[in-house]
Amino acid sequence: MTRLLASLLLALGLLAGCSDGSDKSADPDPTPSASTTPPAPAKPAPRPKPGTCHSLSYDAAVAPTFDAKTVSCKAKHTAETFFVGTLDTVVDGHLVTVDSDRVQQQVSSACPRELAGFLGGSAEDLRLSMLSTVWFSPTVEQSDEGQDWFRCEVIAIGGPEELLLLDGPTKGVLGTDAGRATYGMCGTAKPGAKDFERVACARSHSWRAVGTVDVRPGKGGAYPGAEAASDAGQSTCEDTVRDLADDPLKFTWGYEWPNKKQWSAGQHYGFCWAPEA
């Protein structure tokens, strides 16, 4: 019982300690005692299992907790559970809450780490894809009941604030040409153009990200500034796209460098772009 609920019941006279105004000196009439069976405790939710699929909206996918119903992986779905781990909620001998920074940092580092091995391909393939991971943990109430799991979901970003339907199992998908073609990072126009939108290559597009360039950090690991980030990939991207072009003397290329917000989120590299015929 929560403190709020207990206070409400006391106010309504439904808990001991309330006075009903009757004469306490009179002998109360005997009343038959009723034997009641206490209700059975609620069954805890089952622990998630890897290999299950879910139909999530974009908003649900980025929420901290979500009570998702499992759907058949043969049906339409936007998320697949690829890893289930156990939360460590004890720090220096003391329990910490499931929504504490310490616990959430554990999950936010575990899921991206597990994703790379699950999807296959190279680190570059993952950078050049629209596949990502979101993670869920029990609510505070579920944690209090003893649930200590966290689950990692693989999703594909289809476009701005939109998830792409997953095309079959995703295990090892970036190790295949078909997987890289479906889930690759593409654009509706040249990066920097007014009508540019980043989309999965399964969607209509005219440009494709074909390489990445690491950007050297500034002092103390800080964002180096837009000028330095821009300069970092110009020649590399030009060479990358030249090697892919039908005519190495006549081709178009693009370079998209990280801004300060993207840098703070962990993207310390830029993208090389090439038009698609």
Predicted segments, located by residue:
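N-terminal export and membrane-targeting signals
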Residues: M1-L10
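Intrinsically disordered, low-complexity regions
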Residues: A11-L12, V84
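C-terminal motif of bacterial Sec signal peptides marking the signal peptidase cleavage site
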Residues: L14-G17
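Short, conserved catalytic or interaction motifs in soluble domains
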Residues: D20
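Long, compositionally biased stretches enriched for glycine and/or charged residues
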Residues: D23, D27, P32-A277
